Amino acid sequence: MSIEYYEVDDVDRVIKIVKEVLERFEFIEIAVLFGSILRRNFIRDIDVGLVVDREISFKEFNEVASTLEQTLNIPVDLVILNDAPPLIRFKALVEGIKIIVRDRKKLFYIISVSFMELKDMKEKLRILGIEETHT
C-alpha cells in the first residue's frame, strides 16, 4: 500500500472552494480548515471540521465529504466536531481557519466548553497520578 501525497500551493483557493461547497448545507453552523494543510504544501488529505446544528445522517455526511473530494480532487477527512474529542475540537476551532461561522457566540461557547473539558481531564489525570502527554 502506497501513500499518495498532493501538492497544495494555494490554500486561499482551497478555502474558497470549501466555502462555496459547504454554504449549500444549511445544517453546517461552523466549518474550519485545520491540520497539515496549514503547515505544509504536500498533504495526504484536507482536514475539514464541522459543527452541525443537528444529528446528520450517514448519507448527508457522505454527500458533504464526496462533494468536497470531487470538487478539490484531493481526499478530505471530514470531522464532525460536535462528536470529536475535546483536544481535537479545541485545536481545530482555535488554530484552524474559520471558513463558515454562522453564530460567533456558539463558536466561542464550544471553544470554552472544550477548554474546560481539557482542564477537567488534566486534573483527573493528575489525581490518578498519570503523566500528561504533550501533543
Question: What are the roles of these predicted feature ranges?
Answer:
Residues 44-46:
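Conserved loop-to-beta-strand segment in the C-terminal subdomain of adenylate-forming
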Residues 1-30, 38-42, 53-135:
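Catalytic core of pol beta-like nucleotidyltransferases
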Residues 48-51:
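Short beta-strand->loop micro-motif that forms the acidic, two-metal-ion catalytic signature
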